[in-house]
UniProtKB/Swiss-Prot annotation:
GO terms for biological process: BMP signaling pathway; cell differentiation; embryonic digestive tract development; positive regulation of DNA-templated transcription; smooth muscle tissue development; sprouting angiogenesis. GO terms for molecular function: DNA binding; DNA-binding transcription factor activity; sequence-specific DNA binding. It holds the Pfam family Forkhead. Its main location: nucleus. Residues 54-148 bind DNA. Residues 13-22, 286-306 have a biased composition (Low complexity). It comes from the Eukaryota. SUPFAM superfamilies: Winged helix' DNA-binding domain. This is Forkhead box protein F1. It is found in: Nucleus.
Amino acid sequence: MTAEIQQPPSQPPAQSSPMSAATDKHGGQPSVMESANCATKTKKTNAGIRRPEKPPYSYIALIVMAIQSSPTKRLTLSEIYQFLQSRFPFFRGSYQGWKNSVRHNLSLNECFIKLPKGLGRPGKGHYWTIDPASEFMFEEGSFRRRPRGFRRKCQALKPMYSMMNGLGFNHIPETYSFQGASGTIACPPNSLSLDSGIGMMNGHLPSNVDGMGLSGHPVSHIAANGGHSYMGSCTGSSGGDYSHHDSGSPLLGGGGVMEPHSVYSSPASAWAPSASTPYIKQQPLSPCNSAANPLSSSLSSHSLDQSYLHQNSHNTASELQGIPRYHSQSPSMNDRKEFVFSFNAMASSSMHSGSGSYYHQQVGYQDIKPCVM
């Protein structure tokens, strides 16, 4: 009995040894699992850490900043890398893709020039500098983005802008400008020709435009030979009456040549001085000789047996119905009306051009009309 009673306590140690070993094994497994979990946690924490923010500049601006920081205004590729890494924390991390961006911007952008490598210079790599023609993009530290060829396009468009600004009707060209120093109005003949730009308007304007006139400010009647003289030479006078034009004018004696009236020979309420007397009606012009001028039959609409004002009023009443009358205008507005209508009159009169002999006769004569300043 005693032996049977003593055996059970001896068995538990034998049984306890495998259990203890099992518990040791189970206790060792959690330690390995914990180490693996800790490793994954550290990886997750490392992956969750965000790298520094990228600088708020483009790569072009960063490269320019690096090159401008050098006293010689030139750097190699490795020196540009060093400048960016020392200046911005973003380029110090494990991410190395920014180096490719720097290389691509250096080689593909026209703002940077690769300088030839000097003789006897150790190492490899070329110096990079900024193109002098592109320095305006980065002046005063403002790194502004500009498309390729921006400067060349601006320089190419400058002449066109200046030409467009000079073609406004607010400015009369120099050939028709007022000469205030001498007190006269310069009206040089043959300054505008239909062959050099107005001839392309032939056939597009009605023939009755040359008789167009506004009330109180009639437009001059241009000669019907093609209008190679814009207006006769006009001299300004301080005041007084308009002189009569008698039929015995020496300009009308040979060949039946029509005299081109100047634009500024017509009366204007804004130009006429207060001390001057009203306009005196002109004498009727002498009719053209039909034998000397073969074009007299085709110029029925431009008959010379009527006075200047009578013909102007007749054309205005019969052909220009519905056109408003401008009774009071400023001198600048009158200038514009005369300038535009004179072009129309020249274009319409070019349709009546004929032989070359008639052209030579017209060029030889100039009509001198007194004008009121």
